[in-house]
Amino acid sequence: MTSAPTKGAAYLVLGMHRSGTSALTKALSSLGTDLPAHVMPGDEHNEAGYYESWPIAVLNDQWLRACGSAWDDPFAYPLNTLAPAQEAEWTTKAAELFDEEFGDSRRPLLKDPRVSLLAPAWFDILEAKGFEVRCVISSRGPAAVAKSLERRNGFSLQRGVLIWASYMLAAERYSRGRTRVFVAYEALLEDWRREAGRVCRTFGDPEPEATGEEAVDRSLRHHAGAE
């Protein structure tokens, strides 16, 4: 049983790896939401940065392995069910780590594609803390995502598409019936302010003010012709 929302709103960015979740999170972070304390740095695959909690990503990886799965499992959805005692152990670890990463934030912004697969547990954790859960789902075509995974991880295109399907099925199914909005990667690159405004209207938040600052770098798009 979850608590009635009293603490604020928690924003969860869901979706597949290489589908624009980092760019979307950067845009949302300009709207008064709070990033975690220990943000994963950028690298040669994502120079602008990942905008996600490094410790939470590590925990989610371990959690998936405990379920007999992994972030790159083409058949991760639906996850194997853990015994109640095991599930409670992982939930407690995640809840404590969330507090370490976000402190007293009333508008935490949690992004890790793995959360898409673990969403039911994360929803329960956040609602137990008194947050209203708001889902923002990043979408990008499977061919483009598979091409990006082929380049970064050496996966076959077929495997990349299957992983994409697993994540997107999980993100859609688990967020169904909740307050959510889908943001297409192409639309975000074309006009991030327009998409940010649409997110704000969905959640009843103030729309972003017009500034000269660009939250999304269009030049970071990869494999543009694959979609």
Provide a role label for each language-model segment.
Residues K111-V115, K129-L149, W164:
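Conserved phosphate-donor/acceptor-positioning beta-strand/loop module used by diverse small-molecule
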Residues M1-T91, H222:
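PAPS-dependent sulfotransferase catalytic core
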Residues L97-R106, A170-V181:
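A structural motif corresponding to the C-terminal end of an alpha-helix
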Residues M40-E47, I137-K147, R176-E227:
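The conserved 3'-phosphoadenosine-5'-phosphosulfate
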Residues A9-V13, G103-D112, V133-C135, R180-V181:
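Generic beta-sheet signal
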Residues T21, S116-P120, W192:
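Short, well-ordered alpha-helical microsegments
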Residues E150-Q158:
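Short glycine/proline- and charge-enriched loop/turn segments
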Residues Q86-F123:
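Glycine-rich phosphate-binding loop used to anchor ATP phosphates in small-molecule kinases
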